[in-house]
Each structure stands twice: as C-alpha cells, then as structure tokens.
Amino acid sequence: MITLIIFSFLSFLLGIILSFTAYKFRSQEDPIVAIVNELLPQSQCAQCGYSGCYPYAKAIVENSEKINKCIPGGTDLISAISSVLSIEVPEKNLIITHKKQKNNTVLINESNCVGCSKCASFCPVDAIVGAPNFIHTVLQEFCTGCNICLLHCPTNCIEIKKETYEE
C-alpha cells in the first residue's frame, strides 16, 4: 500500500514537472503563418516546390516567397493571401507562375486494379472513390494531379496523362 502511494506521488510530481517544462519551453508559432496555412488548400500536392502547404506558408511569410505558386488554389488564393499580408499584387502576377499549364488526367487501369483502396486512402483531396475489393475511379474535377496515389499503388495501375499547352 505504501509503495502504491509513493509511486502515485512520484507520478503526480513528475507530471507537474513535465507540464511546467512544456509550458516554459513551448515553441512560438507565428500567427500569420497559421493564417496563411489555413488559406492554402491543404492538398499537400507539392506542385509549389515545397513538401506541403505548411512549409510553403512559412516560406511566404518568413522568406517572402512568391504567393502565386499554388496551382490548386488559383487566383482566389493569391487575392486572399495578398489581402492578409497587405501587399499589392499587380494583375500580371495573378497568373500562376508556370508558363505552361499542365492538365493532368489520372486514369486507373481497371483490369489491373485489385481494389486495395491504398490510393483512395492517401489521396489528399478524396478524388478517388471506390469500395474495398472493388474497382476504383478518379473524379477528374477534384483531382489536383499531385501524384501521391502513384506512390502507394501496389499494382501500378494508375497512369498520369499530362497535357501541356501554352497560356
């Protein structure tokens, strides 16, 4: 019984020490980075050149990165970020930075699809639909062309067809 009381007291004391340490050494996140991150589409597609939306938001705020690199966000996102950061964006900069737009069409080869649902579970925008053990399909209007589904398909039945055209 005394052992139980001693361990309970030590656990309580250790909990207080840990909570104090966590409070004292907490990291200070820039609130503007959080606001810009909330504006981004959170598709984690890496088309901007960063590994995800949070690193891109951090680069926009801290390193003055261009705000027109997010292809899924489009011109509405550029306007929203410019209003949050109180910067003027000339009309010519409202165009996404890539000279050639890539229109990716994602196709699932139904003869090779085993219905494992790995592609659907990793799709950041839920553009792949289908039930487990059944053939899946891609909703093209929601697909951002991030290629994450390609990495997780065990049968390599997903194909990306890239169409490139001048703006």
Swiss-Prot record:
Cofactor note: Binds 3 [4Fe-4S] clusters.
Cofactor: [4Fe-4S] cluster
Any one GO BP annotation for this protein: electron transport chain
Span of domain 4Fe-4S ferredoxin-type: 104-133, 134-163
Record-listed [4Fe-4S] cluster 3 binding positions: 123, 143, 146, 149
Assigned protein family: Belongs to the 4Fe4S bacterial-type ferredoxin family. RnfB subfamily.
Protein name: Ion-translocating oxidoreductase complex subunit B
Originating organism: Buchnera aphidicola subsp. Acyrthosiphon pisum (strain APS)
Source taxonomy: Bacteria, Pseudomonadati, Pseudomonadota, Gammaproteobacteria, Enterobacterales
